[in-house]
UniProtKB/Swiss-Prot annotation:
Its EC number is 2.7.1.24. Belongs to the CoaE family. It comes from Corynebacterium diphtheriae (strain ATCC 700971 / NCTC 13129 / Biotype gravis). This is Dephospho-CoA kinase. It is an enzyme of class 2 (transferase). ATP binds at G11, S12, G13, K14, S15, T16.
Length: 200
């Protein structure tokens, strides 16, 4: 089984590429979706996060107030590392389980969609790395316009991630998403076809 690591900075369009590939028949493990499940009320991960970052992160129903966690965790490298030290091992365990299930089911090409593929040390799980690349200033605009983030918050989150240059240097393939959605769709489909052909 060939495992493709799909990554990119916040606001790069990485998840859009994952959806395009799913439309082409790709099986995708979504690290963000795993993280959301691990943060559901009653989970041991959420319990540990609330102990470290404050019980007031939880609402009356025990649900995580995500924006508040982001405000506390992304304020410094130390706090970000603290959050990652809690979440990354649990996410990695779930990803490994997903990979083993896919292998047992005879999946030929598996996609691991992970925003922190390198930072989390999970690039060792994949055979090829695809980076979705967009200039930082364009990502800031997209985060503000499409996700409703404040400009300062958008810049802060981008700063806390690996630099675009470092990501590109570690990539086997780079998809440039500085153009239109139609261009992204064409580039993503062409690359997926290449992967699918290589395993036939």
């Amino acid at each position: 089984m060939r495992i493709i690591g799909l990554t990119g900075g916040i606001g790069s369009g990485k998840s859009t590429v994952a959806r395009i590939w799913q439309g082409c028949g790709a099986i995708v493990i979504d690290a963000d979706a795993i993280a959301r499940v691990l943060m559901e009320p009653g989970s041991t991960v959420l319990e540990e996060v609330s102990q470290v970052f404050g019980r007031d992160l939880l609402d009356a129903e025990g649900k995580l107030r995500r924006a508040e966690l982001a405000a506390r965790a992304f304020i410094s490298e130390e706090k970000t590392a603290q959050l990652n030290s809690i979440t990354h091992p649990a996410i990695r365990r779930q990803i490994r389980r997903g990979i083993e299930c896919a292998r047992a089911e005879g999946v030929q090409v598996l996609v691991l969609d992970h925003p922190l593929l390198f930072e989390s040390g999970m690039s060792d799980l994949v055979d090829d790395v695809v980076v979705v690349d967009v200039p930082a200033e364009l990502r800031v605009r997209r985060l503000v316009d499409l996700r409703g983030l404040k400009e300062e918050d958008a810049r802060h989150r981008i700063m806390r991630q690996m630099s675009d240059e470092d990501r590109r240097m570690r990539a086997d393939y780079v998809i440039d998403n500085s153009g239109s959605r139609d261009v992204l769709e064409r580039l993503a489909r062409e690359l997926w076809q290449r992967f699918a052909t290589q395993v036939e």
